[in-house]
Amino acid sequence: AQANPEILKKEFGVIGLQLWFHAHGIDESKLSRPYRTKSKGLGNSQVLPRDYTQKDQIELVLLEMAEQVAIRLRRAHKKTTNVAIYLGFSRETPLPSLQASQKIDPSQSTAELRRHVQTLFRQRYQGGAVRSIGVRFGQLVDEAYQVYSLFEDPTLKHKQARLEQTMDQIRDQFGFLAIQRSSILLEGSRTQERSSLVGGHAGGLDGIQ
């Protein structure tokens, strides 16, 4: 569990990276099967098909992964209180892997978790070609657990939750790609490509047939 994930990736490829994520409590079970949580966190990782050097493209992939794992949280009836990202750099980039996390109020909201992942990435990423990437939501609690803030509108929060539940139901019936953001058409997006893959490469995609 204490091994450097970048070294594991170089030595063992995708399997090495998966071993690191599983050692840290990350489960990448396929979402088309009913999920029963067995670990302290849910996550998604992938080795990119090429070096990603543009910040907006790296962020795009992270946000796609955050959405996929948020769906899994709701399916498991859990909320996360810890958001973490992992970036493994290219062999051409002499940088150690970037690992960053932050505590948050309990959430299973796609919109909220995407914002947390985006903020964490923008705060910590300082450049460099990225070749492997991961998102993890840890320290899970039951979805019934609520924390209310004076700065939040409960009505809007409830409407957002209902919207995401409706989207989940549509994807359960017609597949993950039934509802997608226009950003999947942008260069660097991985959602469509990964929808046809199996195993660890497609871990985290919901309802892929």
Task: Please tell me what each predicted stretch does.
Residues 1-128:
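DNA-contacting surface of Y-family translesion DNA polymerases
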Residues 103-209:
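Acidic, metal-coordinating catalytic segment for phosphate/diphosphate chemistry
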